[in-house]
């Protein structure tokens, strides 16, 4: 069995890497890939433990990074959704020669809420962790519903996510658990000033997992970065508003 991550590479142009979020896999980007293929050489990966990389595992951001480094292009634009945004930010901080520009999508340097920071309530994360041990299939489906909640097209969004995720092998429970621990524990806020490359932060106005207040807080922490808010989207703007999403990426890449 291969010890390499599953990468799908297609298209022509500057290198652009797409990282999915927790419980998902690279198939979630299909709508985006079809639109961006004429403009970029796209590198879509199944992170360790997910999709066609389900037989692999990584317990930390750096372990994920080490597996990505084996086949990742250098000087690429990195686009990370949700947990994938944490991975992309980690790459930008610790392996900057691979990241020419950084794009985070519905992501946060710290996902768990605390007194003066908006985010996912710790009890929600611990409930997901408990459910995982009972039935990880149902847990992932619940997470999909949570990601789409609030979007006017929530039902269709969930359908699209399910179609994508279930088209590939199921994630392994060990990696799902490790991912939840990262969402609960990782805090990159103090490291953000060390980011040197151009950065674009994309948010869904209706997102229940990464509240829009996070965008305002990060505007102060990252004054040189750009941000855009998708008005009709919840946690998956590239599913809800794919045309607008691709327009933002093309515009940012061209700068």
Curated annotation (Swiss-Prot):
Keywords: Biotin biosynthesis, Cytoplasm, Hydrolase, Serine esterase. Signal peptide: none annotated. GO terms for biological process: biotin biosynthetic process. Substrate binds at residues 22, 82-83, 143-147, 235. InterPro entries: AB_hydrolase_1, AB_hydrolase_fold, AB_hydrolase_sf, BioH. One of its GO terms (cellular component) is membrane. The active site is at residues 82, 207, 235. Gene3D superfamilies: alpha/beta hydrolase. Its EC number is 3.1.1.85. It comes from the Bacteria. Pathway: Cofactor biosynthesis; biotin biosynthesis. The keyword Hydrolase applies. SUPFAM superfamilies: alpha/beta-Hydrolases (SSF53474). GO terms for molecular function: pimelyl-[acyl-carrier protein] methyl ester esterase activity. Residues 16-242 form the AB hydrolase-1 domain. It is found in: Cytoplasm. HAMAP family: Carboxylester (MF_01260). Belongs to the AB hydrolase superfamily. Carboxylesterase BioH family. PANTHER family: AB HYDROLASE SUPERFAMILY PROTEIN YCLE, MONOACYLGLYCEROL LIPASE. The physiological role of BioH is to remove the methyl group introduced by BioC when the pimeloyl moiety is complete. It allows to synthesize pimeloyl-ACP via the fatty acid synthetic pathway through the hydrolysis of the ester bonds of pimeloyl-ACP esters. This is Pimeloyl-[acyl-carrier protein] methyl ester esterase. It comes from Vibrio vulnificus (strain YJ016). The gene is bioH.
